[in-house]
């Protein structure tokens, strides 16, 4: 059973890596800067886009929080306390919720989002068709 949990976690981690690399390429930020965070608008935008599309292709807030915490720690097998994961997951949810406002505020953000959406459709066609949610509207 533990092997199947590790296998699923590795798949989610691989999805995370592929999508985050693409977002970083589109937003012109470094992956380590996105992981560790920054107040630069380009990094904030990249984080919002990453969370938005990771959620759309099936990762939960907890999945994203755990992967980020493990990447910061440098150990993909580390199991942090659940309270810390849940606290980080709340921040992930705030980023997910801020997507609509960023689209309203920035045409460039919409263009970047469109490029990532096209990438997801191509890269994760099966998952995209089964898990893609509607764009949030306000």
What kind of feature is each model-predicted range?
Residues 1-138:
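Basic, alpha-helical nucleic-acid-binding regions used in initiation and control of genome expression
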